[in-house]
Amino acid sequence: VLQAGLVLFAAASLVAAWAGSAHSLIGARGVMGVAAAMVYPSTLATVPQVFRDRQERAIAIGVWAGVSGLAIALGPVAGGALLRHFWWGSIFLVNVPVIVIALIAGALLVPESRDPEPGRFDLVGAVTSTLGIGLLVWTIIEAPGHGWASRTSVLGFVGAALLLTLFVVWEVRSQSPLLEIRFFRNPRFSAASATTAMAFFGLFGFIFMITLYFQIVIGWDALTAGLATLPYALIMGAMSPLAMVLTSRLGTKLLVGGGMAVSAAGFLLASRAQTDSPYWTFIVPCMALMAAGMGLATGPATDAILAALPAAKSGVGSAVNDTTREVGGALGVAVVGSVMSSWYADRLTELWTPLQVPRDVLGAAKDSVGAAMSISKQLPAAVSSPAISAVGDAFMEGLRVGCYVVAAACLLASIAAFLFLPAHDRPDPEGRHTGHPQARTPQSDRPAAADG
C-alpha cells in the first residue's frame, strides 16, 4: 500500500504540474489526496514492526510526529521559495524526486506487514464519512456568507449530522468496518484521539491565521511569511522526540495534558496581538508556546493510540491517528476561518459606516480582507488612511476570537488527557502496552475493557 500510494502520488503530481485547466488541476489534487491517504497511515504502521523495543518505538514515534508537524509548517516556506523563483507547477514537480528516493528506501528498508484479518473494503462507510465530513466542513465555511441560522446552513448541518450518524451506526454493525468504533469505548483511546484532533485543529487554524496576518496585515510576501513561521516548525520538530524521552519519566498524562495546556496559553497570549506587535519579542514567544505544547502532546498521544492495539492491528491505529489529524486540521481551518470571517465582517461594518463608504463597496470589502485592503487604497485620500486602519483593526478582532476558539479546544483536550490518560503505561515483554482494548476477533465482538 505504501509503495502503491507513493507511485500514485508521483503520477498525480506530474499531472498537476502540467495541468491545462482548473478542472484537471482539481482532479489531480483529488488523486493526490487519495494517494496521501494510502501513504500516511502506512508510514506510522511500520514503526511497531521495525521497533519492537518499547523505548526505541517511543523515540521513533516522536521523530515521526515531529517530522509530520515540521513538514506541515515548512510547506509555506517551500511553496513561497518555489513560486518566487519558478513557475507554479514546480510546487508539484518537486514531489517527484523525493518520492523516487522514498520508493527506493522503502523497498530496501521497510518490512512487509499486514493485518491477519483484513476484511473487505467498507464502501458504505467510506461514502458516508466522506460526504458527512465534507458537508460539515463546507457548511461551516459557507455559514458566514449565508448566515448561521439560514436555511442553507441549517440544512447543511442537519445533513452532515444524519450522514455521520449513519456512518457510526453502519460501522458498529459492519463485520469489516472502515473505522473500528468500538475502540472508542476505551476512554484512554478516545482521549488520545481527541487530543491529536485538537492539536491539529490548532495547528492548521494557527497556520491559517498567521499566514493572513503576515501577508495582509504586515504586508510580507509568501516566502517571507513562510520563513516567519520557521520558529514554530523548528520548535515543534525538536520537542516531539524529546517528549517521547520524557514520557518514560513524567508519564503520558502529564506530557499530553500539560502540552495542550501550554498550547492554550500560547493562543491566549496571541489573542492580545496588535497590528504593530513586534515579531521577535511577541509573535515568536507566542509561536514558541504553541509549538512546544503541541510537540509535547502529539507524540505521546500517537503512542497511546498505537499502544491500545496489538501489533498486528498497528495499521488500524495508524489509520485512526491519521483520520483524527486530517479531520482536526480540516475543521480547524473551517471553524477558525468562519469565526474570523464573521467577527471581521461585523467589526468592519461598524468601523466603515462612519466613513460613509458605499454599501456595495462595503459588501465587497467584507468578503475578503485582501480585497478590503485593495479597496481602501483606492478610496479618496481623506478616507483611505482610516479605512486601511479599520481593515487591520477588524482583522485583528477576528484573529482574537479565532485564538480564543483554538485555546478553548486545546484546554478541552488538556482536561480530557488529565482525566482519562494513564500516568504511566505498563509495557508487556514484547514492548506493547497492556490494559488496552484488543482487536475484534471471531470469538470477541468487542474490545476488552481497559484495566485501571
Predicted regions and their residues:
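Discrete transmembrane alpha-helix packing/kink hotspots characteristic
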Residues: 71-75, 207, 239, 298, ...
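Transmembrane core module of solute transporters
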Residues: 13, 23-25, 87, 124-125, ...
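Hydrophobic transmembrane architecture of multi-pass small-molecule transporters
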Residues: 101, 304, 320, 325-421, ...
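Helix-loop-helix hairpins in multi-pass membrane proteins, especially solute transporters
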Residues: 1-125, 151, 226, 234, ...
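Interfacial helix-cap and linker-helix signal at transmembrane-aqueous boundaries
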Residues: 78-86, 140, 214-215, 246-247, ...
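C-terminal membrane-cytosol helix-exit motif in multi-pass small-molecule transporters
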Residues: 97-114, 132-141, 160-174, 413-421
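Short helix-capping/hinge motifs at transmembrane helix termini and TM-loop junctions
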Residues: 19-20, 52, 109-112, 144-145, ...
